[in-house]
């Protein structure tokens, strides 16, 4: 009931000018889509500020594409649903949008925005994103069914990850889209038991995009960035929501993709 009352005021059908300017100033976007069976995938697109532009409130142009070996690249076809997140960690600002891919070319993507909304600044760890002038792409991504012990250690030490979810319906209702959101907390806020991750669901905006999607479609895509090395850890997972209190999210990993030195960005801690 609360969401039905608040939603129309905060979830917009187009991006206001301040959000368009914000997204255009970002050196990276977190972006998600789904495969043909509804499995969400999430990754990062990077570029110099201005590589994303918004000619109006309902359209975005991205001058760039995911890396050719990133599953996102093969899935972001015209008509595909997308969710995206623009985030400025040192100010804790973030904005989300979803919609459909209009067109793609060798140079980039054209997107139609169906929904746009701001997001709670809680639990964002303050960092500055900087381009590494000496960056060279790392080894090809390694794929496997489960986590290595080194990856379990990485996850236990993480203070940030991103989760992509999707409504199971592919109809024209803008609420039936793909969503990608930020999850953060102090190192150790994620528990790891074999290939199962556990996260307490902290209070935020109470939009319930993530949990609402997972109740209808338990598939999730996860992304853990290594802010020091620019590596990415992608995971497919199946979710279970434990009502609590506290409400808790269990994510059973079904696939792993570890891409060393995938990004030209490095992050430095910023003053809190």
Q: Where are the model-predicted features located?
A:
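Binding-site signature for planar aromatic cofactors or substrates
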Residues: 1-272
């Amino acid at each position: 009931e609360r969401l039905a009352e608040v939603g129309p005021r905060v979830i917009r059908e187009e991006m206001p000018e301040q959000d368009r300017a914000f997204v255009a100033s970002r050196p990276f976007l977190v972006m998600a889509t789904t495969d043909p069976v509804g499995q969400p995938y999430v990754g990062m697109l990077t570029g110099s500020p201005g590589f994303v532009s918004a000619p109006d409130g309902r359209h975005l142009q991205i001058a760039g594409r995911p890396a050719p070996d990133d599953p996102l690249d093969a899935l972001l076809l015209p008509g595909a649903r997308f969710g995206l997140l623009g985030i400025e960690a040192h100010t804790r600002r973030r904005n989300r949008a979803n919609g459909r891919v209009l067109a793609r070319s060798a140079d980039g993507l054209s997107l139609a925005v169906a929904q746009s909304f701001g997001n709670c600044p809680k639990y964002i760890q303050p960092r500055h994103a900087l381009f590494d002038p000496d960056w060279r792409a790392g080894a090809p991504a390694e794929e496997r069914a489960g986590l290595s012990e080194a990856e379990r250690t990485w996850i236990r030490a993480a203070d940030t990850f991103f989760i992509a979810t999707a409504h199971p319906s592919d109809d024209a209702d803008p609420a039936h889209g793909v969503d990608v959101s930020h999850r953060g907390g102090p190192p150790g806020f994620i528990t790891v038991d074999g290939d199962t991750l556990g996260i307490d669901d902290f209070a935020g905006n109470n939009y319930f995009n993530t949990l609402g999607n997972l109740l209808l479609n338990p598939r999730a895509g996860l992304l853990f960035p290594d802010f020091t090395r620019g590596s990415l850890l992608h995971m497919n997972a199946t979710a279970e929501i434990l009502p609590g209190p506290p409400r808790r999210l269990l994510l059973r990993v079904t696939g792993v993709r570890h891409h060393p030195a995938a990004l030209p960005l490095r992050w430095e801690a910023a003053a809190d």
